[in-house]
Structures are given as C-alpha cells and as structure tokens.
C-alpha cells in the first residue's frame, strides 16, 4: 500500500506541479516548438514556483526541488535538460520521510506571437505558461535558487 501511495505522490509532485491557476487551453494551430536555447533562457538559473513547492534549474543541468503534500515534504536532487524539440525534462530520486522514488518528468513548450504554451508529456493538457505581455497567473520563474 505504501508503495502505491508513494508512486501516486511522486506523480503529483513531479508532474502535477505546474498547473497551479493556469487555464487549460488547446495548443494554437500555427505554433512552433521552443528551441533548446529558448528553453535554456527560460529556465536556467531560475526557480519555478509550483503550487506546492519550488524547483531550481541550475547551470550545467543540475536540478533540485521540494514539494509538500499534506504534512509530508519531499525533496529531489537530479538533472534537467533542454531539448530542441521543445521539451524540458527533469529527473531524480524524490525522497520523503516514508519513501524514495525515481521520477522523470517532461514538459513540451510551444510559442505563438510571443505567448508560450506548455503541457506535461505525454498526456497533459495544454495551458498558457506565459502570456505576451505577462499576466497575473503566469508561471512564476524567479532568478536564483529560491529552494534554500
């Protein structure tokens, strides 16, 4: 039972972390994928504030994060990468008081008219990651490591 619960929690922490208050939308018909450089510019050296945690995307592909579900806190130290097909992936061993699990999570990014769309792969819903111009409710990426 604990194993099933911990796997479900990892899925929530590693994958369901991004949506927050974002509105689910369909991807635009004439979008293009973000390039590796655009993804690096978007994430590298920044902390991403999730609904229940924070992740930091360091230079040279290092990744660390924490998340809290109920009264249980989990942490991860691992790797992240930007790919030319618009994907950003992070992976590592999530650890909490009662469990440890490896997870790899990927998001794909598209852009149209400066507006960035994102979805978790392979089956997530598209949502607006960042409006053009920025709006309240856009995903929060802040310079520096805010996980400490």
Each predicted region: which residue ranges?
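Bacterial N-terminal signal peptides that target proteins for export
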Residues: 2-12
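Lipid interaction determinants
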Residues: 21-79, 83-148
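Bacterial N-terminal signal peptides
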Residues: 10-20
């Amino acid at each position: 039972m604990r194993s099933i619960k911990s796997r479900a929690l990892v899925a929530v922490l590693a994958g369901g972390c991004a949506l927050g208050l974002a509105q689910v939308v369909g991807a635009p018909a004439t979008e293009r994928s973000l390039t590796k450089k655009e993804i690096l510019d978007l994430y590298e050296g920044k902390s991403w504030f999730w609904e229940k945690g924070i992740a930091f995307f360091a230079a040279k592909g290092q990744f660390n994060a924490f998340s809290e579900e109920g009264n249980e806190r989990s942490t991860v130290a691992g790797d992240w990468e930007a790919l030319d097909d618009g994907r950003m992936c992070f992976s590592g061993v999530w650890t909490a008081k009662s469990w440890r699990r490896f997870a790899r999570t990927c998001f794909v990014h598209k852009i149209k008219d400066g507006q960035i769309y994102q979805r978790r792969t392979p089956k997530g819903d598209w949502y607006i990651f960042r409006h053009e111009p920025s709006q309240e409710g856009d995903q929060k990426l802040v310079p520096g490591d805010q996980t400490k």
